[in-house]
Amino acid sequence: MKCPVCGISLTYHKDINGLYCHFCGHKEPMPIKCPECGQSALRLQGAGTQKLEEEIERLFPDNTYARLDLDTAKRVGVMDRVLASFAKRKTDILIGTQLIAKGLDFDNVGLVGIISADSSLNIPDFRAPERTFQLITQAAGRAGRGDLRGRVIIQTYSPDNYAIKAAAEHDYEGFCREELRLRKLMSYPPYYDLIRLIFSGDDEKQVAKEAGDWYESLNEMIHTGFIYRPQPAPVNKIKETYRYHMMIKCPRGRRGLFLGALDKLNRENNNSKTRVNVGIDINPYSFI
């Protein structure tokens, strides 16, 4: 089921027994039957922190545990209390998201389990392997900080992926060599600058037309680099606002040429009566 306001999939949350949009906060009750086919045999799947909490409770009934994620951490004082309890060994098992993967120093962690370690590889972002390697390395670094040797278990469907293998082997240099080789081959940073244009507005047809007009104009003005046709953004709609994006790969040293052309088009857009907003992001950190 998708959010009627944002157009993205809703996420089930056990604490409200309902569906929740992480972009706009829209909530819906858990459906009794499928809204498409009418079948009532609905089954919850996935390996989120709430599901892990259920499994921990079932498998380790004699151990104490706590969960730390965005849902629990936003409550005042919860994060400090949970971490203090774990540090004092009053809590045996700490379940969490990336919140607990870095920046924490406990001398009593003997085992770290990284669930679905390859899930970040599926994000449409050229930095996905780097972020996967970074996350595994940081999470693994929580184990074995005291006198006892730590152990790390990585769950993955892609054990042969170079980012997963390098992280498991603590091979930073090997990962870096392969990552830079692929980025050079695909004309990604640091060999090229990446410029992302984001077009947004409340009329999808107008947003798509404006993006197409910019694409045509840029191709007439510039004859170097790579200018890709605009497409709906991975998250195409947020809070009733439609979003398209266009990617440009700019050779190093030619950024000024592209920025000059974009500045000209942006001034023309500001002087027009169009209701489409245009954002320009150089070497963006997110492509969502």
Q: What spans do the regions from the language model cover?
A:
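Short amphipathic alpha-helices in soluble, non-transmembrane regions
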Residues: 210-216, 257-267
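Structured alpha/beta or helical-core interaction and ligand-binding surfaces enriched in interleaved
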Residues: 227, 252, 261-265, 270-276, ...
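Short, intrinsically disordered low-complexity segments
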Residues: 229-255
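A short, structural micro-pattern
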Residues: 146, 191, 240, 272-274
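Short secondary-structure junctions
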Residues: 60-63, 218-226, 270-275
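Hydrophobic helix-cap positions at the C-terminus of alpha-helices
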Residues: 85-86, 143-146, 218-221, 265-269
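Inter-lobe coupling/hinge segments of SF2-like helicase ATPases
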Residues: 1-198, 203-208, 245-248, 252-253
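A carboxyl-terminal module marker
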Residues: 216, 220, 225-239, 278, ...
